[in-house]
Design a protein with these regions (language model features):
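Inward-facing hydrophobic residues that define packing positions of alpha-helical scaffold repeats
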Residues: 102, 147, 163, 170, ...
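A cross-kingdom marker for long, charged
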Residues: 341, 393-397, 405-416, 420-465
Length: 465
């Protein structure tokens, strides 16, 4: 019998050509590849427990009704992790976890009044004290979508009116005028890991304290390009982050937010897909961590007050290579986000299949078990201070977070390489590196999301009958 099985050629993987908005069907690639349903169910449960309840968990409950997700190595809770936790909870029907995370987010992170009403402070200490006031736009993106799904799954009469909460955020993120605070960047404190988001003023005003503050506008979506901002106010509204682009989320808003903006959200989805074409390299499919709205690289990006180059021996030193144009931590999410849009909508299927295979071809050239976690867009490795540090280390690694998202891209691919990436991901262990570095938070969440994708458990949640 075994000899007969070995003689049968392996079935080629064939990406689906229609999205779940149309079919209401979800592909289980792991079962297609030969893993049993029982093995797949056990794996998803195991990885979920690792993130939420295991010895290296990042989810912590507070009292009888709240909880938070922490970037443990940076000792904070971020809108990224809180909204990811809510999305995971609604996907896996964990209502208690969802409600705890939302209550904590609303109490400590969300601005209830003032110029930032409805937005969320991107980082808080685990006691709820804010590290910064400003928002990072991807948090709002996930909060809104997760709340709409919660409304669709559980209704709005179990203690939290999820739809009303989503609609409030959607109303607050529309362009509004405000007068920035004097004294520099309101949310731009020197906080470990990022340096702060959401300044009260742009760089020009920060360098001229005598100038009276000019009225500015705050918005999650840039009105001119219809693309998501890096931050809704200050310096960050002048550019975007490719990893914040999840076009299918806008389609969820268009279908079920009931905010009177359906046509606008569909247009945002269209513009977001067009942007992704522009921001990736045509040979490697790599993108930069941040870029201009036209997809071009950041030019001279720096934090205000920090010099571009230094004088040495009387001669100006060339400015350092701009690491924000490199593929690194934020960028890991892009292949998985494009996978999500492919699975749910498939409105840009031909390009997305090209992207998936081009991206995996590049990673394959670097070694399935050895590819590094940061690259320049041309595929060369960054050097020195151009390497973005994490957890006290400035080092290139083979990180399981990128292993996860590279494997997730197999949902768009038909070449045999994709099987190798999935098998490598299945076998990969989430454990400390030899030098002690370990990221339970970001690596752990991306690992869980990827297994949800590959098992068909990351789904559109329509209103329940």
């Amino acid at each position: 019998m075994m000899s007969l099985l070995l003689a049968i050629p392996a079935m080629a993987l064939t990406p689906w050509k229609k999205g779940a908005f149309e079919t209401n069907q979800y592909r289980n690639l792991l079962v297609e590849m030969g893993y049993t349903q029982a093995e797949v169910d056990a794996k998803v449960k195991e990885v979920f427990n690792d993130v939420f309840f295991g010895p290296n968990k990042v989810y912590f409950e507070v009292g009888d009704s709240m909880g938070y997700v922490s970037d443990v190595k940076n000792h904070d809770a971020r809108t990224e992790g809180m909204s990811y936790g809510m999305m995971i909870a609604v996907q896996l029907n964990k209502k208690d976890i969802f409600d705890r995370l939302w209550r904590w987010s609303k109490k400590y992170m969300q601005h209830q009044d003032g110029i930032r009403e409805g937005y969320f402070a991107w980082s808080c200490r685990t006691d709820g004290t804010r590290n910064a006031q400003g928002a990072a736009s991807d948090g709002e993106l996930y909060f809104i979508t997760a709340l709409i799904f919660a409304s669709n799954r559980w209704g709005n009469d179990t203690g939290i009116n999820y739809k009303a909460e989503a609609q409030r955020i959607l109303n607050c993120i529309q362009p509004k005028e405000y007068t920035p605070e004097r004294g520099g960047f309101g949310g731009f404190g020197g906080f470990g890991g990022f340096g702060g988001f959401g300044g009260g003023q742009g760089g020009q005003q920060a360098n001229n304290q005598q100038q009276a503050p000019q009225k500015q506008k705050m918005y999650l979506i840039d009105p001119e390009t219809k693309l998501i901002t890096f931050t809704p106010d200050g310096f960050g509204q002048g550019f975007t982050d490719p990893s914040y682009h999840i076009p299918a989320f806008y389609e969820v808003w268009a279908k079920w937010a009931d905010d009177g903006r359906s046509d606008y959200w569909y247009e945002c989805a269209k513009k977001s897909r067009e942007f992704l074409h522009k921001c990736v390299d045509q040979k490697t499919a790599l993108n930069g961590d941040q870029c201009q709205y036209d997809g071009s690289e950041m030019q001279g990006f720096r934090f205000p007050g920090r010099p571009q180059g230094q004088q040495q021996g009387g001669a100006p030193q060339a400015p350092p290579r701009n690491g924000n144009n490199n593929f690194r931590y934020d960028s890991w999410r892009v292949p998985m986000n494009i996978t999500l849009d492919y699975e749910w909508s498939c409105a840009d299927g031909e390009w997305q299949r090209w992207y998936g295979e081009t991206f995996q071809n590049f990673m394959y050239s670097q070694g399935v078990d050895t590819f590094m976690d940061q690259f320049r867009k041309d595929g060369t490795l960054p050097e020195g201070n151009e390497i973005l540090g994490a957890g006290g280390f400035r080092k290139l690694r083979h990180s399981i977070g990128l292993v996860a998202t590279t494997a997730a891209a197999s949902m768009m691919c038909s070449h045999d390489k994709s099987k190798e990436f999935v098998d490598a991901f299945w076998k990969a262990k989430h454990e400390p590196f030899e030098d002690g570095y370990f990221d339970a938070y970001y690596d752990g969440l991306l690992r869980l999301f990827a297994f949800m994708h590959l098992s068909g458990n990351y789904r559109i949640i329509p209103p329940q009958k």
